[in-house]
């Protein structure tokens, strides 16, 4: 079955007789002019058809025949594409073609003619010494040293202070809350928003960080100072309480010592060997020790076999006058047969003798020559003695 086709005008198909009988829907349209392409040659870029006269660079309008570059639906020549989307010069912010010779300083890239001092505009060559600023600007060594000398000479003069408005300060504070140490692109954005120089923004953040650090340090020092003051105050109050308690009692150290000596003198002789002799009303010899107060509790500090102990004798201690001080009135001598003899002094009318005698006892150690041991059984000599009544 044959299909009829509409034949286009003769002027439109002049030179293209092979297209007779082809539907118009199958003829491609140009991406540049949106018309059907009836030319002998058709250009195709990224699945899009072009007239040979419509394929041009979007920037320089030069017709593209051999090679082209596309970005976001537009086509460019090589030069314009790298100028627009390639690496940009740090000084002029223009793109750098890949075939062009460039200069590099750290991470910054420059055109040859842009690699120059910002003060004298002298183009820097290979081997020249220069200073690189933080924002990428270049200063030759001679101009930098000259500017530094001028700054040193004018250091005595007061420099004008930078005034920051309330709106600018609010913007900087909000940025500081987000990041106390912002990156370079953030500082550039803040500089453009506030209208301040980039160096001023950087110095403001540095001063802000230093202030926060100083405040934290001062707060910690203040807390420790309060702690030390409280400890010192508590120690002082405890010392005052002790002094006040001593004052309330009304007794000094000298008075207390005097009273102790007086009490000891009133009690009599308090030697460990003799026990409490001043108030003896009745005594009993128990296992080589004196009864301290007549209640039956013996003084157990004497050791068996000690040459300085009281020998175990059947004699008892006679009653002495009560409340007679013995510390200053007794004179002790040693007799080879009688043991220890106390001569009478002030307030003493009798002689204290510790008698010794009897055969060797089985409980004795025989450590002393002048003190004979007692017999084995205490009953052999205890029954013969008349004890004073208690």
From Swiss-Prot:
User: Gene3D superfamilies, alphabetically?
Assistant: Cysteine Rich Protein, Homeodomain-like
Gene Ontology BP terms:
animal organ morphogenesis; apoptotic process; medial motor column neuron differentiation; motor neuron axon guidance; negative regulation of apoptotic process; neuron differentiation; placenta development; positive regulation of transcription by RNA polymerase II
Q: Per its UniProt record, what PROSITE patterns does this chain match?
A: HOMEOBOX_1, HOMEOBOX_2, LIM_DOMAIN_1, LIM_DOMAIN_2
Q: Where is this region: Interaction with 5-mCpG DNA?
A: 199-211
Location(s), subcellular: Nucleus
Annotated region Disordered: where? 230-253, 356-390
Residues covered by the LIM zinc-binding domain: 28-87, 88-150
Q: Does the keyword DNA-binding apply?
A: yes
The reported result of mutating residue 190 to R is: In CPHD4; the mutant protein is inactive in DNA binding and pituitary gene activation assays
The segment annotated Interaction with DNA runs over 161-181
Instruction: State what changing residue 84 to C does.
Output: In CPHD4; has impaired activity on CGA, POU1F1 and TSHB promoters but exhibits normal DNA binding to the CGA pituitary glycoprotein basal element (PGBE) and interaction with the POU1F1 protein
Q: Which InterPro entries match?
A: HD (IPR001356), Homeobox_CS (IPR017970), Homeodomain-like_sf (IPR009057), Lhx3/4-like_LIM2 (IPR049594), LHX4_LIM1 (IPR047956), LIM_Homeobox_TF (IPR050453), Znf_LIM (IPR001781)
State the source organism's domain of life.
Answer: Eukaryota
In terms of one coarse class, where is the protein primarily found?
Answer: nucleus
Entry function: May play a critical role in the development of respiratory control mechanisms and in the normal growth and maturation of the lung. Binds preferentially to methylated DNA.
- Per its UniProt record, what PANTHER family does this chain match? LIM/HOMEOBOX PROTEIN LHX, LIM_HOMEOBOX PROTEIN LHX4
Question: What is the official name of this protein in its record?
Answer: LIM/homeobox protein Lhx4
UniProt gene name: LHX4
